[in-house]
Amino acid sequence: MAVLAGRTQRVLANGVYSGLAVTAALGALALGNALRHGLMAPMPAQTAVSASPQVDDARGTGHAAVAGLDAGALRHAGQGAAPSAALSRPISALSRSQGSDVPGNTSVSVRATSPRPLLATMPALEITPLREIPLGLVGDVAGLAQARDFMLVLGADGRLWARGLNTRGQLGVGIAQAQVNDFLPLPGHDYQAVAVGGAHALALDRQGNLWGWGDDRYGQLGRGRANHTPQDRPTRIARDIVAMAAGDRHSLAIRKDGALLAWGENRWGEVGNGSQESVTEPVVVGEGFRAVAAGAGYSLAIDRQGRLWAWGRGESGRLGTGNENDQSRPVLIGNGYRSVTASTAQSFAIGQDGTLWAWGSNLLGQLGDGTHEDRLSPVKIGSGYVAVAAGGAHAVGLQRDGSVWAWGSNGVGQLADGSLDDRLRPARIGRGYDFIGAAGAASTLARRDGVLRMAGARLLQ
């Protein structure tokens, strides 16, 4: 999940942690589909190919011009970059994850996380309609970050509100209550971006201070040591920050001078410092960066020249290097990128020309290229995109004309198209929203005036 500050975006959440563990999230999604279709689908072959897919419209079939170059952003839709796993909107060039892209700017929301075990919702396998989520006292929305079982909303007034599971202090509201059903305010009132990981969260205030709270067992809060006692209120991690991203158990940030910082779990090399030892305080792993995204055991970043870099876990091709090898230091993937989104095992990027690219796991068609084949290198999906958010095995995209598109697994109606049919290519599902989000087996569509609707698995009860 990633975030930039200073700009509003159209990406609510990247679903990076929407399937925190490929086994828990993706596995549950696969099982749901298997039950629905009567058998388990075979694992797709892993190949790297370039495709120029046809785009299906939810109401029929149509075609979309698929042209473009590289890409890279989180959620993007307004005039700027969008963070991974959170609410974002493009600016000049966006989730959340969701996520971010414009040099020197920060996005408004961040990326998201993993879904509740789908087995709980599986028996009925009914379509969950697009439903409105009451925001209580929040008011107008400027950003949103949703994780597997909790959600953070950034108000237009700079205040943060939280609701959901709180077993690791991930709400940041300073109470020991395990579940909070109404949105409660966090301390402080000058935030501009928020991001969520597996069970921790990050927020950036307007002075460039980076704050963190929640689970710190892997040093993901950057306090100098791993802590088994959760941090239930925001604690300052760093200063002079302009972009950030929260992964499953690690965190990334970019300083005003372009230095890329990383810390937390490092089992797969996701910190990028050349080792596999956890890092409990921020370390510099690169210079000249402007955007970051953090996924499940891996990291993505875009430098000021528009070059895309990847490191960490390589399984299923999520790094886009052309193979499945893990990388403990940043590896160059390509040029011409504007923003990037990281999720469980699939990645998306938007090129400087608005083309959408995807790579990684594709078991349930979540890449949108018309196949079930994993892609070890970026393949072109479509054009005209300003934001993309990724869930456990589905994705939602926002085009510059305001239309919203969805594709991938639809076992619990997360594509918001009124069906339970998976879609291997982008299908238009609506328009008129300012923000999009995806996490686990759920999708979120929101407007600036505080209207927030979700489809799919209920992340919040």
For each feature predicted by the language model, list its residue ranges:
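N-terminal secretory signal peptides that target proteins for export/translocation
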Residues: 1-8
